[in-house]
Amino acid sequence: MCIRDSIDYFVAGVGSGGTFTGVAKHMTTLGAKNYIVEPQGSILNGGPIHAHATEGIGSEKWPTFLDRDLVDGIFTISDKDAFNNVKLIANKEGLLVGSSSGAALQGALELKKHIKKGVIVTIFPDGSDRYMSKQIFNYKESNDNE
């Protein structure tokens, strides 16, 4: 992995908080701002708890390994956006990623709307091969996930 000195923003989902905290500590030394991505239904951004289809990220409580002092902001992403990005990444980049990766991309795209310029780094933590039996490329919204 090549880390550049010109990274301005780090965006990633949080499960246990370990990956986010470890990477964010380093990104902070580069002067980067760190943003969490969570699915709707997770409580990190103060929203109500409910079921979500985006797997691997999101929480009903603050994760033990997440260092809150490293968090500069939180983006809450719909399942629809996460799964649409799974298809987009496969079609445009040929990468088979899972829904938490789709959410990470959406978080980076949301951040891009709020900044004038800068280098954004994100992590695609999962592959779609884990979710083929769940029809990851044929996601259908339910009324409670939007």
List each model region and its residues.
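Short beta-strand segments
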Residues: 12-15, 36-38, 121-125
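Short glycine/serine/threonine-rich phosphate/pyrophosphate-binding segments
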Residues: 13-24, 100-108, 131
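Terminal helix/beta-alpha structural elements that buttress the NAD(P)+-binding lobe
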Residues: 7-9, 32, 95, 99-105, ...
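Conserved small/polar residues in nucleotide/adenosyl-binding loops
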Residues: 1-6
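A short, charged, Gly/Pro-tolerant segment at domain boundaries
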Residues: 121-133, 137-139
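Conserved active-site loop/cleft motifs that coordinate metal ions or position small ligands
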Residues: 96-99, 119-124
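Active-site/ligand-binding loops adjacent to catalytic centers
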Residues: 28-99, 114, 135-146
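Conserved acidic residues
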Residues: 8-11, 72, 118
